[in-house]
Swiss-Prot record:
Residues 11-280 form the tr-type G domain. Keywords: Cytoplasm, GTP-binding, Nucleotide-binding, Protein biosynthesis. HAMAP family: Rel_fac_3 (MF_00072). It is found in: Cytoplasm. The gene is prfC. Increases the formation of ribosomal termination complexes and stimulates activities of RF-1 and RF-2. It binds guanine nucleotides and has strong preference for UGA stop codons. It may interact directly with the ribosome. The stimulation of RF-1 and RF-2 is significantly reduced by GTP and GDP, but not by GMP. It comes from the Bacteria. GTP binds at residues 20-27, 88-92, 142-145. GO terms for molecular function: GTP binding; GTPase activity; guanosine tetraphosphate binding; translation release factor activity, codon nonspecific; translation release factor activity, codon specific. Belongs to the TRAFAC class translation factor GTPase superfamily. Classic translation factor GTPase family. PrfC subfamily. It comes from Vibrio parahaemolyticus serotype O3:K6 (strain RIMD 2210633). CDD domains: RF3, RF3_II, RF3_III. The keyword GTP-binding applies. One of its GO terms (cellular component) is cytosol. The lineage of its organism: Bacteria, Pseudomonadati, Pseudomonadota, Gammaproteobacteria, Vibrionales. This is Peptide chain release factor 3.
Amino acid sequence: MSNTPFLSEVSKRRTFAIISHPDAGKTTITEKVLLFGNAIQKAGTVKGRGNAQHAKSDWMEMEKERGISVTTSVMQFPYNDCLVNLLDTPGHEDFSEDTYRTLTAVDSCLMVIDAAKGVEDRTRKLMEVTRLRDTPIVTFMNKLDRDVRDPMEVLDEVENELGMMCAPITWPIGCGKEFKGVYHIHRDETILYESGHGHEIQEVRIIKGLDNPELDEKVGESLAASVREELELVMGACPEFDKELFLTGELTPVYFGTALGNFGVDHMLDGLTEWAPAPKTRQAVERDVEATEDKFSGFVFKIQANMDPKHRDRIAFMRIVSGTYTQGMKMNHVRLGKQVSISDAVTFMAGDRSRAEHAYAGDIIGLHNHGTIQIGDTFTQGESLKFSGIPNFAPELFRRIRLKDPLKQKQLLKGLVQLSEEGAVQVFRPLQNNDLIVGAVGVLQFDVVVARLKSEYNVEAIYEGVNVATARWVECGDAKKLDEFQRKNQANLALDGGDNLTYIAPTMVNLNLAKERFPDVEFRATREH
């Protein structure tokens, strides 16, 4: 293999995910990004209005019904001279650990903020996960065609709450009905906005220079004057863009626009493709693996059931870390110590699968999984590697699950264990009774589990409330102390789907007391797969 074409393929890759609070406009921005990448001709909106198409990235039945993105889909498209892999993550209240884990498979993130609301709860949580790997973040302030808060105020909020410096690249001219466009600080030009072009790419209308009298003519003298004044303040108060600080996650370039009005998305994409990193080195337990190494390696970060209602299949999403995938190649499935030949991996344009003949470091491919692949599994061309940093997160919501037909206990357990390997839910079996407790990060996960138990395992189950506030994985280097801890806390101990010891706390106070009483025991909120 001549190395130059391979290196150029890897350096072209940009793999990113979008993070946001529910309803900040993430699915809309995904659509518009695909429109600019020419992956779709006309953008759909999520809640179908009459003949508006369903958004391309929301394809599971449940999503179509509820107008939300439940599953993480992957879309690949060309933009500028790059090949972009966009991982769409559920932004709804009802999302799962999938969202967290998807963030371990990307090299950068786009944070979408509703400029009327500022930093919201879900965004904070997702940002904590990106902090684990210092992921570079590009920010898009959305919904400028509505009345929004003072942009400076929102930038301050991002700096204070998320601990990142903000470097505006574009600046809004007016907002709501008065929204006239943005001034691009780096290019010294104003790009004018015209409403009513949400479903197509707008004709670009540019005014060069901030002091150009044409600006006063087009946006009105008083608005032009106040923008010049604002910009003087912005240039003085905000840091300039610094690529090094961006790459370490300390500074974020900020763009303003409206995803629904399809304005500003291309400016953000220009910045993302220019500055966001190509596939990076990844840490394995054994060594660091460079993206540009010849030998193939990759890890599974998510398993998705029923991507094709016609086939009851499961697809394992794999991030390629190094080397090239070619159709029919042999790989080592490290956890099982088994050689497998993969000839039917797929690439994605949400919902449209096509067979992958080649894929490179940075790409996401789908492997057909018949129950042998788990989250966190590594595949290599021979070497035994285990990539680190693919966490399990302690659930925040708990229910006891009960069968309508008690004779199906075996199928229920099998179904729950498989769904937990897939990351759809976590399951806990208390040591002192035969209960099955299901833990999730978002409410919708519970609905999904019951629906899938019925359709895939023919098991009808219902939920009951359970007195559990939180769960922690328990570890202790001293076997004697661990033994004492287990003896004294039997009533609060359970095994998870992978038979790991877990402490189930009825209240946070109970957990804190246990930590005080057993200082040598570690109570972990995350656990490596």
